[in-house]
Amino acid sequence: MPSHFVSPTPTLPLPAGWRPVDLDARAVRALMTARAGGASQPPYDTCNLGDHVGDAPSAVAHNRRLLADHMQAVPIWLTQVHGNRVVRLSHTPDPSDPDVITPVAGGAPQPHADGSFTTEPGLACTVMVADCLPILL
């Protein structure tokens, strides 16, 4: 791993199968999760992050907190719809632009979009994939 790569949270051991993505970029961090390491019961065992598949909401909330703790960032989740909308994540609201998404205490409705980007530290562009290929630019 390059010496300038910063693991999401070096002080917390990653659950089995979770891997930091080795990027040659000073300001970009990435993490790929696996099914192990969470609180979900079968058939979602154990680290299900999807709140749309019928898993217990408390288990999904626990798993998402675990991920946020490891990332040391606020994950912004999308409702992915196989469309062409890309949203910008920001700490500062922009009421004139519906494609600017800000974190809200206690959670917020997940925007319907298939991509996100940010230039601000502390925000995580978060996507879930099953049979799709995630792209990080």
What are these regions (language model features)?
Residues 1-137:
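Active-site microenvironment for binding and transforming phosphate-containing groups
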